[in-house]
Amino acid sequence: MARKYPLDKYRNIGIMAHIDAGKTTTTERILFYTGKSYKIGEVHEGTATMDWMEQEQERGITITSAATTCFWNDHRINIIDTPGHVDFTIEVERSLRVLDGAVACFDGVAGVEPQSETVWRQAEKYHVPRMCFVNKLDRTGANFMRCVDMIRDRLGARPLVLYLPIGIESDFKGLVDLVENRAIIWLEESLGAKFEYQEIPEEYKAEAEAARAEMIEMAVEQDDAAMEAYLEGNEPDADTLKKLIRKGTLAQDFVPVLCGSAFKNKGVQPLLDAVVDFLPSPLDIPPVEGVKMDGETKDSRKPSDDEPFSALAFKIMNDPFVGSLTFARIYSGKLTKGTVLNSVKDKREKVGRMLLMHANSREDLEEAYAGDIVALVGMKETTTGDTLCAPNAPIILERMEFPEPVIEVAVEPKTKADQEKMGLALNRLAAEDPSFRVASDFESGQTIIKGMGELHLDILVDRMKREFKVEANVGAPQVAYRESLARPVEVDYTHKKQSGGSGQFGRVKVNLVPSERGAGIQFFDEIKGGNIPREYIPSVEKGMRETAETGSLIGFPIIDFEIHLTDGAYHDVDSSALAFEIAGRGAMREAAQKAGIKLLEPVMRVEVITPEDYLGDVIGDMNSRRGQIQGTDTRGNAQVVEAMVPLANMFGYVNQLRSFTQGRAQYSMQFSHYDEVPANVADELKSKMA
């Protein structure tokens, strides 16, 4: 089956919003109207009548899918769910990566809230073209122009107003369309599906004229000929205006602003028109960049069906009916059922079923094309952030470097019944989120979960309770410290046990040399002349590595050093693999004591985005946390502070930052490197651990 919709008719968009700005209602209404104007596939053959919609309305459709497809004006719109939480920069960045454009929803009463600032800045970083929808204009206290001012002042954007509300709060009944220069009035009884075009009411004419002139002036900046014609007194017609607005939106010179009330079913159709008219298709986006399998050579794929197949898996979801679903955005080529290559893991995967998620049904696909967003069933190896591609033309679209977790907490199930459920739940969550790890503590037998920050673990524990119904007690968060050797050292260690019968004997001579951060433990076998038989050497390495894992000073792993096994001795009868493993353990313990141990702590790269008024407070607070300021910068009209701060000093930071900036600043942090702990702090830690 050939492609139904050409690529320029695709819109891959996300709806970004603060938690209460009405993201779900807006998405739900979009699906309601698009479902109405388009019978979905052959599933109903015209049975998609109003009654089916009313049940949907009673139930209040909640879109659980990570990507939903709908149709409007001969265009195909894929709506990708963007997470509301910002602490997971990984999540947000990944969803922005697969979007081509975005709609930012704002609450008509509250305007631009801190959370909306955050998501906006992320989208700015990734150069995602976007437009704004000021929602909830039917609420008491709603004020459209105040929201427009906030978009200008708080986000530093240039708002281009396309619609004005007619009536406000409980009298809100329609919109003035500035491009077409007419009024749109919704008819109450049709659930917002019917509206009529009228002349602009007398009392709105002056305001509409002023707003329209301002809009045209901003739009004609995009084209010299249009600008000249306008200055000579010729206004551009509606089609020309739309082209100019599209050009400016894609170039991110301004953001179109629309308004309405999704809950009261007003303003959603103009929003859909604007998505089609102004947001980019996959063809408007530069080719997707990647690297070849060597990890070095740059490579790219154009958005075309003729290019080799490439796609990015951006979300893994568990579905009650088909099990695990892998959502992937296809950037190039086409995908049929069969084998694809997971280039990040270098493993082959079989595509058994491909599904397209509609608002209320799923459609099995035989083929999918560039620009599509599909759910794949039955992927065994693929995790979030992996690239899928044609085996004969491999490419890695994104090296998702998932940072090592830096914070850990112990979790204990409350009852015996929770024990098994907890194991399952944690494994499921770890599959969905690669920056989350589960381990069990060697000595205490406790389950330890590790993640990127306090909020990250809080939310995962919360999901465990809500989605998997597991009740658990959670310990206090711990920093994942590490130990390292203070200087090179040579050790000659003999393990000997003779007590009648066969004994144990093994002698090893090793040089240990500290190496640079991130090098790990490297083992070099430099035995000459068979002083230790080949088969015993892995045992020496095993013993040393395992002992390094349990640490020496306060029980954290010793990292980043080289082991050179230079000499040793064995006994024909008494030597065994076990004897050499014990000798390796002893040598490691002795080496750690002789060399001395330095304590290392994780240092985080922290980025704080704050309004200028609080800049001094933010920097002062950073310094008090042993932070080193790397620099400050201006983004839009906010100040960005970058600093390196030890993780141990970042606990509870979010609450403190909120309190002295009144909730207007936000921060993100990522692991940067391990660094030596100052002596006074290390002494405190030792006495605490003891």
Swiss-Prot record:
Q: Which SMART domains match?
A: EFG_C, EFG_IV
Q: Which GO terms describe its cellular component?
A: cytoplasm
What are the alphabetically sorted keywords of the record? Cytoplasm, Elongation factor, GTP-binding, Nucleotide-binding, Protein biosynthesis
Q: Does the keyword Iron apply?
A: no
What the entry lists under InterPro entries is as follows: EF-G-like_DII, EFG_II, EFG_III, EFG_III/V, EFG_IV, EFG_V, EFG_V-like, G_TR_CS
Which GO MF term does the entry hold, naming one? Answer: translation elongation factor activity
The keyword Protein biosynthesis belongs to this UniProt entry's keyword annotation:
yes
UniProt-annotated location(s): Cytoplasm
Q: Pfam families, alphabetically?
A: EF-G_D2 (PF22042), EFG_C (PF00679), EFG_III (PF14492), EFG_IV (PF03764), GTP_EFTU (PF00009)
Identify the residues that bind GTP: 17-24, 81-85, 135-138
Functionally, this protein is described as follows: Catalyzes the GTP-dependent ribosomal translocation step during translation elongation. During this step, the ribosome changes from the pre-translocational (PRE) to the post-translocational (POST) state as the newly formed A-site-bound peptidyl-tRNA and P-site-bound deacylated tRNA move to the P and E sites, respectively. Catalyzes the coordinated movement of the two tRNA molecules, the mRNA and conformational changes in the ribosome.
Please report which protein family the annotation says this sequence is part of. Belongs to the TRAFAC class translation factor GTPase superfamily. Classic translation factor GTPase family. EF-G/EF-2 subfamily.
Q: What is this protein called?
A: Elongation factor G
- Please name the taxonomic classification of the source: Bacteria, Pseudomonadati, Pseudomonadota, Alphaproteobacteria, Sphingomonadales
